[in-house]
Amino acid sequence: MPAPACNGFRIPLTRRSLAHPIFKPRASSKKTESSCAADDRTSQRPRIRTGVSSSIHNAAMTAVPDSRIRVLRDEPPRHGGRYVLYWMIAARRLEDNFALQHAADWARQLDLPLLIFEPLRVGYQWASDRLHAFVLRGMVENRAAARELGVTYHAYVEPAPGAGKGLLERLAREAAVVVTDDYPAFFLPRMLAAAATRLDCRLEAVDSNGIVPMRATTTVYPTARGFRRYLQKELLSHLGQFPVSSPLQFAEHRPAAIDDDVRRRWPEATDEVLAATPDALSRLPIDHAVEPSPTIDGGPRAAHARLAHFLEHGLPIYHEARNQPDSDASSGLSPWLHFGHISVHRIFSEVMTQAGWTTRRLAPKPTGAREGWWGAPESVEAFLDELITWRELGFNFAANRPDYDQYESLPPWARASLEAHASD
């Protein structure tokens, strides 16, 4: 059975759970506890989304915040579409995923099955056995979980550069709506822009990257302190807008039909390929000199195991020992965050639940300081500054600066520092 709807703190959304202490407002808030509970209940109900598109202004949707949704191609849902297509490219997980939640809600509203399409190309920069194996192990878990719930999942691993060309368009031809992940870096922005011109149906990109939506502001912050002050002003409202823990419970649990010609031309990845066996990897045109990691496995299961290890062993000493390589104090979660196998919302909720934290502990005013604002133990505040401030500063920059990867995009103080040490 799927897990119950969850607010991100592993707390089932029931009338009783809405009084959980982690959701109690800080003392200075003008809202009462009961009003906050009502807000939380409302956020889990289907609602009317307005202001996104005149063509679907009356579509009832669940509470994926508007600030997380970009309409890349504004069309009404295709009449006669056979399914809703979720094109999984960044948030490669079936839990705590705003994009999957949004796609599942579309499927429910249109009374259509959901088709999850997770591709892996070979032509990306630095493609290697190590990176491929990491992603493939996550795909194995995603396929098994989707099948258990009766949701159609199509894993496609490109055997040669360009072999997957046309597959997205072919799947989208039968889709009422296409939902995908919004991600501001690498080749993904170009890929989404190209898809918006090639597809002939509604295309929406949904941001699951951070606690605060990366496009909630168009201001680019050149310093962590400035961004931290912005976060401290905005975070409280976003802490009540976590993704549903198990969004597939809301999808139509019936198969989505994929045409035979699609399966013949773009066959689903075999068990051998998804297992990332040496033979399977050797047949792919990727860098075989960079072998799979012998100690780090991809996938949500390994991500959650690493998080559990960190909570027990690393977090208590994080503020003192995170920069000491032999201490095992760092979280080690970066690979799974990078490939979308675990969400920042889940990490935050596990950390704060262990700390016994509630929003009542927040400082009444933003300070921009690294310590003291959360009202949490020193080790927790140090970790949150890395997990939220520094990580989401990068998303803010990349989302608002198309030239984020160019030297000229660096703020003057950073360029001055680099130039001063050019001869080091």
Regions found by a protein language model. Name each.
Residues 421-424:
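Short, intrinsically disordered, charge-balanced linker/junction segments flanking boundaries
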Residues 5, 9, 14, 19, ...:
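Terminal low-complexity, poorly structured segments
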Residues 11, 15, 20, 25, ...:
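Generic detector of low-complexity/intrinsically disordered segments
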Residues 57-247:
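Trp/Phe/Arg-rich N-terminal binding region typifying the photolyase-homology
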Residues 79-80, 220-413:
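Glycine/tryptophan-enriched, flexible segments
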Residues 6, 10-17, 23-36, 41-49, ...:
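Low-acidity, Ser/Thr- and Arg-rich intrinsically disordered low-complexity segments
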